[in-house]
Amino acid sequence: MKKITTIFVVLLMTLALFIIGNTTAADDYSVVEEHGQLSISNGELVNDRGEPVQLKGMSSHGLQWYGQFVNYESMKWLRDDWGITVFRAAMYTSSGGYIEDPSVKEKVKEAVEAAIDLGIYVIIDWHILSDNDPNIYKEEAKDFFDEMSELYGDYPNVIYEIANEPNGSDVTWDNQIKPYAEEVIPVIRNNDPNNIIIVGTGTWSQDVHHAADNQLTDPNVMYAFHFYAGTHGQNLRDQVDYALDQGAAIFVSEWGTSEATGDGGVFLDEAQVWIDFMDERNLSWANWSLTHKDESSAALMPGASPTGGWTEAELSPSGTFVREKIRESATTPPSDPTPPSDPDPGEPEPDPGEPDPTPPSDPGDYPAWDPNTIYTDEIVYHNGQLWQAKWWTQNQEPGDPYGPWEPLN
């Protein structure tokens, strides 16, 4: 009897060690350890052995509004449950972002350091949008990327995106975007000679064909391409194919299942066409966006935890679709991690990243509406009233009940 008991105990210990060993192996898996230093070869993203790499992951929303969703716990959940291999930290420059509040870069640092600890790649995104010409804040961009590349240039995890979405008919690749990149890239290369740099292209990073005709000389540059499945279709896929034929390396650093406004839809059939297109061409991508904002491109439902552990009910239709697509191609099958504990489930989570909808007593604190300015979610003063943009708009006067402006007082 004693012998049988001893054998049983040994078997139990062996089984326990096997389970622990497998769990540790899954938790310790690092896509960065697997692929190492990324580079460009023949217009394609490759690992340190020269093998093609396709990264898939999520982009944050604006860190100044929804930064509470960008933290070690949420990124770990995305790695372990979704299977992401890249995370994009979207630091708006205007709209209450870095130019007005430089402290938002601390959230970028938090994202980068979490990604390093978790062994995934991370995109540091200089998110120009309403400031449509990257040259508007060129000097600030140079200072910012000098700091980031000095801090993190030794880590192969890091990817720099130096101009999210240049836009406007007077902002072209040849005259504005490429000259800007030719000033910012050397600042990064002074500290970081190797890591990938993504450069935005014209018309909200759609005009990759123009960049392909006049490429930058840095060997490890990629060109940003963005699309929204409910708005963009075959004509833009043709532009990507043209750019690839010219040997340009393309990174889809932002895409959504919605219309280009970030809302409307979702368009899952159209999104699947795009997913297939990107897979067939081995294009890396980051989906917009990790937030609980009440818009269809958001991955989470209102009220979702900012630290991961999301149930199916907490995922939006877009989030459910994107999670499934990432999990389908994960190098290591994602585990089913234990949701992080909530120390006080009765208390609602704070939402410090969202703008305060309550206007100040003095409307003069906000600028007057300007028909020539591009707005995305800014607050303006017009006809004795404060208004906030609900989506991208230009030359649409506040006051139209079906328009993009919402009254605040």
Swiss-Prot record:
Binding site for substrate: H61, W65, Y66, Y92, H127, Y228, A260, T261, W288, K293, D294, E295
Gene3D superfamilies found in the cross-reference section: Carbohydrate-binding module superfamily 5/12 (2.10.10.20), Glycosidases (3.20.20.80)
SMART domains (UniProt xref): ChtBD3 (SM00495)
Disordered: region residues: 326-372
UniProt feature, compositional bias: Pro residues: 334-343
Stated family: Belongs to the glycosyl hydrolase 5 (cellulase A) family.
Protein's UniProt name: Endoglucanase B
Organism from which the protein derives: Evansella cellulosilytica (strain ATCC 21833 / DSM 2522 / FERM P-1141 / JCM 9156 / N-4)
Organism ancestry: Bacteria, Bacillati, Bacillota, Bacilli, Bacillales
Gene: celB
